[in-house]
């Protein structure tokens, strides 16, 4: 089973690919897709999808796992995040991947044992749980690894 974990965002989206071989988890790759707020939204969404499409074609995941989002007090921010999620879900559908969504507290609890963990705690734990992740310093990238990890260890596939 290969899972593409996605921490959805418009400005700094984290992605990660983690595989489960027998009972072992194996980190394959991860990264961050950054877009500029100066660019028009449709160009930003297209860029995000073009990078994620390359990841899908290279690693051939069976499933995508994405963080559920909450409604922000800033409605414009929430709407833009909704655009990003919709574009990502459309790409996931185009490649006929199964998809799971996880609440932020579920991800935090699965990775750290505490549902209200801070970003640095998640980063620390993924480095302990998955060999190969030591070079990760970006919290969006770490969150994407945590999302893929959560999908695999909760057997939510």
UniProtKB/Swiss-Prot annotation:
Binding site for Mg(2+) 2: 67
Active-site residues, as the UniProt record annotates them: 7, 67, 140
Protein name in the entry: Crossover junction endodeoxyribonuclease RuvC
Comment on bound cofactor: Binds 2 Mg(2+) ion per subunit.
Listed Gene3D superfamilies: Ribonuclease H-like superfamily/Ribonuclease H (3.30.420.10)
Enzyme Commission number: 3.1.21.10
Main enzyme class: hydrolase
Source organism of this protein record: Rickettsia bellii (strain RML369-C)
Signal sequence range: none
Annotated compartments: Cytoplasm
Binding of Mg(2+) 1, residues: 7, 140
Gene Ontology CC entries for this record: cytoplasm; Holliday junction resolvase complex
SUPFAM superfamilies: Ribonuclease H-like
Swiss-Prot/TrEMBL keywords: Cytoplasm, DNA damage, DNA recombination, DNA repair, DNA-binding, Endonuclease, Hydrolase, Magnesium, Metal-binding, Nuclease
PANTHER family in the cross-refs: CROSSOVER JUNCTION ENDODEOXYRIBONUCLEASE RUVC (PTHR30194:SF3)
Membership in a protein family: Belongs to the RuvC family.
GO molecular function, one term: crossover junction DNA endonuclease activity
Subunit structure: Homodimer which binds Holliday junction (HJ) DNA. The HJ becomes 2-fold symmetrical on binding to RuvC with unstacked arms; it has a different conformation from HJ DNA in complex with RuvA. In the full resolvosome a probable DNA-RuvA(4)-RuvB(12)-RuvC(2) complex forms which resolves the HJ.
Gene Ontology biological process: DNA recombination; DNA repair
Cofactor(s) this protein cannot do without: Mg(2+)
Function text: The RuvA-RuvB-RuvC complex processes Holliday junction (HJ) DNA during genetic recombination and DNA repair. Endonuclease that resolves HJ intermediates. Cleaves cruciform DNA by making single-stranded nicks across the HJ at symmetrical positions within the homologous arms, yielding a 5'-phosphate and a 3'-hydroxyl group; requires a central core of homology in the junction. The consensus cleavage sequence is 5'-(A/T)TT(C/G)-3'. Cleavage occurs on the 3'-side of the TT dinucleotide at the point of strand exchange.
């Amino acid at each position: 089973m290969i899972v593409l974990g996605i921490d959805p965002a418009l400005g700094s989206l984290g992605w990660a690919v983690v595989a489960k071989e027998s009972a072992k988890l194996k980190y394959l790759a991860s990264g961050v897709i950054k877009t500029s707020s100066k660019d028009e939204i449709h160009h930003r969404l297209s860029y995000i999808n073009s990078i994620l499409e390359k990841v899908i074609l290279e690693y051939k995941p069976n499933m995508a796992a994405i963080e559920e989002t909450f409604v922000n007090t800033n409605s414009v921010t929430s709407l833009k995040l909704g655009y990003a999620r919709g574009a990502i879900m459309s790409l996931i559908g185009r490649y006929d991947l199964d998809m799971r969504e996880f609440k932020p507290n579920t991800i935090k609890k699965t990775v750290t044992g505490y549902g209200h963990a801070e970003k640095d705690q998640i980063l620390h734990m993924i480095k302990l749980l998955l060999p190969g992740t030591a070079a990760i310093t970006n919290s969006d990238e770490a969150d994407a690894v945590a999302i893929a990890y959560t999908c695999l260890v909760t057997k939510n596939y």
